[in-house]
């Protein structure tokens, strides 16, 4: 195996894959589009990855890891369940995690995960990490309900014609939390 000229090339390709998914949609992503966005020769695609499925798996695995770290960061100063409810509310209301780019990637991942078992596993692992974070303050069933609420309310918050106020979101979070 020859040495790679650019030690960051593999990571550039992974990041360009996510960019291609955002720009073109998952079904229009090609090796050529990714290589162009990454600024690498087309041959690099098959040098580092066995095919588009492996590339999508690596890209979405990277994306969900980053999202999990951002998710956990919202809870870094939380010491109790009421504090966790406040953090959940902040996460939804601030849209810091649910940026337009992140939301586009989430939509694409949801759509493809229903047809690709490996990507479904990526989704399941991501949900498990989120729920484990919440289980620091809530029992597993409540953590799962809160995680589902966060996903759904995040979608509603970024698409509603008139998003809810922070106080309205907090009341809903507290209801789900019990």
Curated annotation (Swiss-Prot):
Domain HTH tetR-type: 7-67
Key words, A-Z: DNA-binding, Transcription, Transcription regulation
Signals that turn on the gene: Autoregulated.
GO MF terms held by the record: DNA binding; DNA-binding transcription factor activity
GO biological process, one term: positive regulation of DNA-templated transcription
DNA-binding region positions on the chain: 30-49
Keyword Transcription found: yes
Further comment found in the protein's record: Has a strong cooperative DNA-binding mode, leading to aggregation of RcdA-DNA complexes.
Function: Regulates the expression of a number of genes involved in biofilm formation and stress response. Target genes include six stress-response transcriptional regulators: csgD, which is a master regulator of biofilm formation, appY, sxy, ycgF, fimB and rcdA itself. This indicates that a large number of genes must be regulated indirectly via these transcriptional regulators. Acts by binding to the upstream region of its target genes.
Listed name of the protein: HTH-type transcriptional regulator RcdA
Species the sequence originates in: Escherichia coli (strain K12)
Gene: rcdA
